[in-house]
Amino acid sequence: MRALATAVATALLMSTATLAAPARPSIGKGAIDAAVAGITAKHGAAEEARARQGAAQVAARWFPEDGDEKAYTAFCVDNFLSGDQALSGAFDRLETVLEQVDGHLLEVRRMLLTPQDLDTGPVTELDRRLGDVDLSAHVDDDLFKTKVAFLALLNFPVHTLADRLKDGASWSRDTWARSRMMDRWALRVPAEVSQDVTQAFTAADQYIAGYYIRADKLLGPDGKPLGFPDGRRLITHWNLRDELKSHYGEGDDGLAKQRAIQKVMERIVRQEIPERVIDNGDVTWNPFTNKVGGGGDSPREPDTRYAKLLEVFRAVRAVDPYAPTAPTYIQRKFELDRQVPEAEVEKLLISVLTSPEVKALAKRIEGKLGRKLEPFDIWYAGFSSRAGRSETELDEVTKKKYPTVASFQAALPDILKGLGFRPEKAAWLSERIVVDPSRGAGHAMGALRREDKSHLRTNIPKTGMLYKGYNIAIHELGHNVEQSFSLGEIDHWALNGVPNNAFTEALAFTFQARDMELLGLADASAVERRKNEAYADLWGTYEIGGVSLVDMGVWRWMYAHPDAKPAELREATLSIAREVWNKYYAPIFGVKDVEILAVYSHMISNGLYLPDYALGHIIAFQVARVFRQGSFGDEFERVAKQGRLTPDAWMRGAVGGPLSAQALLDEAK
């Protein structure tokens, strides 16, 4: 799970009719020509091409409140820079200042969200209101108002994805850094619109963070307790999925628990779940009959899940008028953020979902299980090194090893050395990662200033760390290590990070895959582990690939039905989930109209994030092959330090070839 810093209380429900009309650029061609003429008269004809590009970039974002055409022309003539020394000086100054501004504001944001993100006690109404405060929402607006952004737009080019794919291979690191800096001003979004987006994501995130199911209160079809441990509290969807995974190899009792969890998931996505069973240890619930024990009425949850998603949709849709080159959130996520066209991502996922290797693997899984596949077997965990070990056994190991947050913090150097990082590098990393007690399942929150530290949020109960929490924490640690390298050891701050979220997920997966090894419980040979890794990665990509297609389909539907009500979105989501299942899963599982692909919480709180997980599995497999050929720690550092190039350039630098699922399919074969 990537840091939720960007998914941070209730957005304004803005319908099409209530969206405020955006201010529009007001500069005509004559004013642009006059600006170019003034610049070339001052700096020479050799600067005409740069002058025209810069003047046009400014004009495209110059609103009436910025001044009339005369003011625009004067600004361009007065602020155009020529010569390498002047341009380098301006870039260096901007890069230095932006690191400090963005970094300090992130630290403020982290502090404001502390009561909601961390398990520090009850969350008050004041805490919730403070969580709505996002000072960073106004930064770029202020940079436009003060014309700092216009100075940058006048002097440095804004590149498109097409530009980078065409010319990026020949660019220097300086050119890449300048190009990345200018991404922040490619769009001009008013602060109030950005604030609404922040509030919508915060509301969705906090809704999900409190969505626990009391497994110890679940009843089976016969009305009897299913035997989950007392106090077992599972957040949706992460813990539900991981609890389900943990019961393979436990015979009929494990199978009964898995079927119950699937039924819980179905009740959640259909919004048939009785509202009062959510995080309530005082009542029992039979998800098969949907009856609640304890007396009293038990009305269903009133489509809150889909209302939160609509709030997110309407908030991000309000950005559309300010993004002429990417006028939908879908386009912005794929072309600006992910930097891989939507159609290309879909094609890549379908290549896995329809591959003969998946069908062959399904037969292998059926053989291992000794029964026909059931829908929840999309989360089959029998290829992991923990197969055959009970959840209770693993919990006892992790509780003893990591009884507190402080103990996990103290163990970071040894964990990192166990992964293959040199002692001095393990110490360097441990000093830059802070472990916090998470209120939710856990996440990684990176820094934006090299003097700051990244934060690993992990959920450790008073009785000690459970295996599920440990598994998530090792994944999040992978994010933190990537964040530490891609910020702390980058040559240009403007290049900090990785091309998109899929890449940090990929690097985190390489940590998570070794969780049992770090506990000293990996007993298979290296060859056997590699084979199981290929099977697990292929099956995991098959599962999350379908989930991603549902996520993408839901966003397309919302854009086609912008005035939809929560109940309509619920029915559309379920229909899309059934359609994807029937096309790519029913032929293998032999069951139609299954809806559990819609259970992922990311669909509600993270806005089209799920395709990054699918891409992450594919990237992780390609990267892991390189890591095996050398020192894991050294290779991880090498690839992470490349920074925020295009996905294609990053992959070629990391593994010597483009992003492709073929390596995964070949290995599984």
Describe the function of each predicted region.
Residues 234-240, 382-388, 444-456, 477-489, ...:
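Active-site-adjacent bridging/hinge elements
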Residues 7-16:
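Bacterial N-terminal signal peptides
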